[in-house]
């Protein structure tokens, strides 16, 4: 953010906010890198303290079901909508932050397979010794894609699903998975992984990640200010650097 733009954003977002608060956030890992870049700027500008738990979709749902208390939730848009329906997120509070496609990675130094077309990807999957995928939205999509490709039965014994909260990049880097799939934002800069690219255009899928105010939030106004800060035009570069499209 430029000094001028940041100064304007601070004035518009924090004008009239007299007290600093602690904002408790439960967040998906897909937006983590961009979020970590932006939050310290927000804390410095606002005086608020942000405490964040980053985890996978399944674990986030378990935490909410167990009654853990937060002020702001960041998950996929469909998950936010579900939590609005079940009363855990305030209706009308959903704000879309950014969207991410699904990327492909292999262990650093390994030959990069051909994923340029759907047919090439299919051949690569059939030839791979092991295939990593997640429990999150990207994993759900990939399981459906394997079925639509007609290869689900042939590759089932090679599939390696990471536990919730564990990056697919970790099992690629360790060699447990020869090839792996996860959100571009989670995979493209993972240590020990060479990023191959996104899925072919005709089967490309995007997931929108959104925020929502938790019902009964103690610091709802401060949480809303955080959302305004990380969705301001000047914050877009932080998401773009991680392969995400803001908004």
Where are the regions that the model predicts?
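Low-complexity intrinsically disordered segments
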Residues: 1-5, 25
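Bacterial N-terminal signal peptides
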Residues: 4-15
């Amino acid at each position: 953010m430029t000094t001028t733009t940041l100064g304007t954003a601070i004035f518009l977002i924090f004008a009239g906010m007299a007290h600093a608060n602690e904002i408790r956030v439960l967040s998906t890992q897909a937006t983590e890198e961009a979020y970590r870049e932006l939050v310290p700027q927000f804390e410095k500008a606002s005086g608020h303290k942000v405490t964040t738990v980053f985890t996978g979709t399944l674990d986030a749902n378990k935490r909410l079901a167990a009654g853990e208390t937060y002020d702001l939730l960041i998950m996929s848009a469909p998950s936010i909508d579900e939590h609005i329906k079940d009363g855990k997120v305030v209706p009308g509070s959903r704000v879309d932050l950014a969207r991410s496609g699904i990327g492909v990675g292999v262990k650093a130094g390994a030959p990069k397979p051909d994923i340029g077309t759907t047919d090439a990807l299919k051949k690569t999957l059939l030839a791979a010794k092991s295939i990593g995928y997640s429990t999150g939205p990207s994993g759900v999509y990939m399981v459906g894609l394997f079925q639509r490709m007609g290869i689900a039965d042939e590759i089932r014994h090679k599939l390696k699903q990471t536990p919730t909260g564990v990056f697919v990049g970790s099992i690629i880097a360790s060699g447990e998975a020869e090839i792996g799939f996860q959100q571009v934002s989670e995979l493209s800069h993972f240590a020990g992984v060479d990023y191959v690219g996104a899925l072919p255009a005709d089967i490309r899928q995007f997931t929108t990640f959104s925020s929502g105010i938790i019902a009964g939030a103690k610091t709802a106004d401060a949480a809303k200010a955080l959302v305004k800060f990380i969705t301001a035009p000047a914050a877009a570069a932080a998401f773009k650097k991680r392969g995400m499209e803001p908004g």
